[in-house]
């Protein structure tokens, strides 16, 4: 009889923090430091000694031949929850989701359970980049942090061939939580599907400032 497999005697669960997403095999795996299983002392357990965790994908992604959305969008510093696929052996973690919160302090790369990267080594981050606010996207909670930048980008008194002029309209953004559904990338590309009553919008924006809004 096979020993130590998921579901045999229930599941062995964990919560933890992602410390590495540079999977050498490019399978979307991440290294996770698990609360209660791993110490925060990196001299005892350095990041590179943590096991690679597989990331469970939704059924809208086939996990086959690149179909669907890949790779998983976890970053260093993400809090996650999962289980050990090999149960009590605890060498094959599987992540089933993330846990948002309200970070109260910036990461300390000298300790575990933090983004281990320093600013000079992080392409984006290190995370969190903001503290004392919700992990929800700012635009999803009604904070239009693009408003001032957009005002400077708006064109007005643009001439036309028939001698008339026109002006680019201001954004109708008036999002109310929890009805604005936002997807944002690390570099700043944004996609919004806003279901705020009487203010529904679709908005897609390139980090350079180019956008469309319906």
Sequence positions of predicted segments:
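Amphipathic alpha-helical and helix-coil boundary elements used as assembly
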Residues: 1-214
